[in-house]
Amino acid sequence: MSVILNASVNTKSAVEYRTISSTQSHLAEEQSERLHKWISKDQLEKLHAAFLNTPERHVGIDELRIILEELDITFNDSMYTRLFLKINQNRDFKVDWNEFVSYLIFGFQEEDPSSQKESLILPISGPPMVRKSEHRSAICCLALLKAKSDQVPIDEVTETINFSFGGEDSPEASGMWVTASHEGMMRFWTSHMEPIRTASSESIVSTYAFYNNGKVHSKLILGDYAGNVRILSYSPHLRGPFQAKPGAALIEVIWSDVLKGKIPQFFPKEYINLHNEMISCVYFSLHMNALFASAEYRNTKKYRGRCPGMIMVNYDERSNFRIPLGVSTFFVAESHNIVVTGGPDTFVRIWDVYIPTEPSAILTGHNGGIVLVFVQPEENKVYSVDYQKIIKVWDLHEHTLLQTYGDLVRLIHHSETDMTYYYHSHLQELVVAGRKLISIKCCPRVRVDLADGNTHAAPVSVVLYNRLFRNVVSCGLDSYIIVWDPWTGRRKIIMKSCHTKMIYGEIIDIEITAACFDPLEQFLLTGARDGSLKIWNYNNAVVVRNMSIMPDQEVTAVIWVVDRILPMGWDWQVTEFNDVVGREYGDPKKWPKFHTDDITCADVKLGEGVVTATYSGEIIFWKLETGQPYRRYSVMDPTRFIELKLTAEEEKFIRQSKRLASRPTPGNHGLQMGRAGRSTVLNRPEDNRDYGTDIPISVQAVLFLQTRPQTLKHGSVFISLDTGFIQVYSHHQRGGYMVEFLAVHKTGDCVLTMCTDRKNRYLYTGTAFGYIKVWHIENFCVPETEKIHVCMPKLRLEFIFLRKELFLTRAKRAVRNQAEPLLVSSYKGHLKAINSISFINLPKIIFTGSHDYSCRLWTQGGRYLGTLGTVLPWSKLTPFERAGNDNHLYRMPPDIKKVASSTTLKVISGIQAETRIKISDGKPVEDREEDTAQTEDVTELRKLLDKPVKEPILGKHFELPGRSVLDQHIELDTTQSYIAVFTQLKVHSTEMLERLPTPAVVSRVQTENYLDHYIPVEGKVDVSGSAINIKQPSRRRSDKTNDTRNVRTPRARDLIALEMSSSHASQS
């Protein structure tokens, strides 16, 4: 049975829209619909001439087919209908020359490899890691100690891929950091800035690197204050000249002796007066066998801008890169043959190493001198840091600014200006050293051992499959719309900042919360959190139309039927927009406001009705043609009849609006008054209703079964509640609630999204805990006469979840008493909530969008196919063949592998772990003995668990204490919602302990006074000597009159104390 959908009621064309799931369910081979691959230049000129010869300069569906057939470009009926709908972007069923050429251009744009490299997030998006330097002064030197140099010989260079398997964390690959300060302290750190040890040095430390390849000589490059550059080469074999010699702990070498060749292991080379100023930076390129040296020329009156800021020396040839004020730092990208320089003039220049006369690009934007530049060739990005600690990221090819990062200004005190920088090319980290150690991730590699990558930079809200273009469209809370090719895993188009809002002069991205396609699936409709709606021609990222419901009211659901658009959300009602040519920009129609809370979800049955549900559990069925409600339910009491009745104020408003509409007023004055009055009435709170208030159960998702008729005995609407149950209703006028079933197996979980296949045989659900469940609903809530026989062996071949196990798993235990619907698959697909789920009919592929930023593809049986946006190779898929192969070994998502249960492992891997072992006579003796041992183990385990264990359970090694004679019966208080356990405890009163007498020695120590043993010391300074002579006075006599303890009155004690202090002051 084919699915036919007319484009418009006013259209005379007989275009029928058939999907690949219609009568033409399979093709002999995949036919390409991309005309840009077929049409040559001569054919294109003939097509242009044919368009010009037409009377109205545009052709219809039949005329275009005739023109293409004259050029030997033929299609079958189904493929040509799809092609015509793709070309006809104006939806008038007439194609002009501009539309035809635009379609050819879109074909080339889809194959543009630059669209694959555009990043979803900023290059520096993660927070920096800050540590104390643990040095007494600021760090003056920062180096990386590695076993292998960053420069790799040419024969060992491989293609760089931006993902890793976690091997860079090892010390052999990432090395360790070494920091040094002016007081001579050196500290060693791991690659993740964990301290290892501390050392001290009294001399200047120079750094050098060894090449593991003994054929390549190591080079120590020295630049001095006079502008000279010296190169010292030596062989790294057996540590070269740095071998330890007996009897000599330190070997001192004089440069003149090295030049004279007295040390044969050194090969020196000098470049005298290479620069006229101090050498600021040197580098030797192993690939180009060239030396780069730079210097700063700040004396503009002396050099007048004609200074060679950087010089490249290749053998005896010199290339001068003339830059005003010279060069402070540079970076050589050998894979691209470019040099990036930065200096005091605040400009970043990109040079071709073979064209030193003029830079390829000049990047402006810094307000201070450049202190560091480095390049990421695999990411095509240039990073620059200025004196004011501002980091800017540039695109290497387009020469545009991508990001300005200013967090270093906040983390580092403004008085710290001399900072030390080092870029770790292997870990892709920038380390800034001063009083603190700060590590910044710069486009970090994806750890494929932890995750497969992300589809969006924020949670995915909606995923849709377009049957016309055969692609997947994902929308996220990052305000991105991304078009994916699910058959190759490529990203076709990315649209950023789709919904925006200006707040205090700053443009803020608004989250996309709802989306759908038009009936012919040519355009995309999106709704945002601020109530805005946009219609997109998502093939060229052009906004066709802007709409809006009430301001700052989130759009939770959008429905697009023929000639009408129905958005709804937190405004408690349905708003209807026209989609007819000529009436697009009229005022929207507001449906009656019967809801008393925010609308959370909605769905439509073409030609019959619409169902809406709210946060408070209200369900209303509407007539699609008239927009009038005909039934109302509450999920708390679904069998109770609720009358559809407006309040008195709403009825008064309706009569008033009709009277104003019929009154003849000039212009649009009456229309404006009607809108004003409507806004004042609809914005009021409706707390006076006696139903639907304070209901704790909310509706999370609704689903219409399109193939089920509108009868009393057919359950056609599925309602998902936050309690984990799914209620089934009939949308007939006299229908209602039929049955409910539990759709989750964990406490607190609930179904957030649902979808079905084309024939409504299976129900696919995604839960808040990340579980994907598949239900067989073909015989669920249908009359007995329409039920069919279910072949369970066939289902077990497709769904491994149904195969028997030794123990009943948790997902099966939850539905063991539930006859219908039949749970055929259950597994954990995401770590976080699944916000959207959809299904592709012919290849039987499920794709889910989750709160964990990813969109994943699965087979109907539960095998994992991949994540959109992954860096790993993509599985071979086609829209004309069923996905999944029983002989193929499928892998698991790395994040799910760590938390997967036995059921998830079995379903995703497709391997039954527990199988019965049978012994065959043809096996060797050793295999028979091993199989016999395994069989005996399984048999003993089943004997142990099939019947109660005999006493004593714990053996003879432990005996339980005997019970008391009196059996204490505890009566629990169950009147409240919880049981207070502490009220059931028996509390014994405490008794005072007998206090032992205090020993005489302790009593005597307690009564002692330290003043009895205190003897003051007099100190007098002898002027003649340099030391202080301490004179000890004679022991003070014990005078009872001066003892304050013998004085009875407080006043007398105060007088004696004052007298004693005055005497001490006079003596001193």
From Swiss-Prot:
PROSITE patterns: WD_REPEATS_1, WD_REPEATS_2, WD_REPEATS_REGION. Residues 657-687, 1026-1068 are annotated as: Disordered. The keyword Repeat applies. It comes from the Eukaryota. Keywords: Repeat, WD repeat. WD repeats lie at residues 155-199, 201-242, 322-361, 365-404, 455-494, 507-546, 594-634, 746-785, 829-868. This is WD repeat-containing protein on Y chromosome. The gene is WDY.
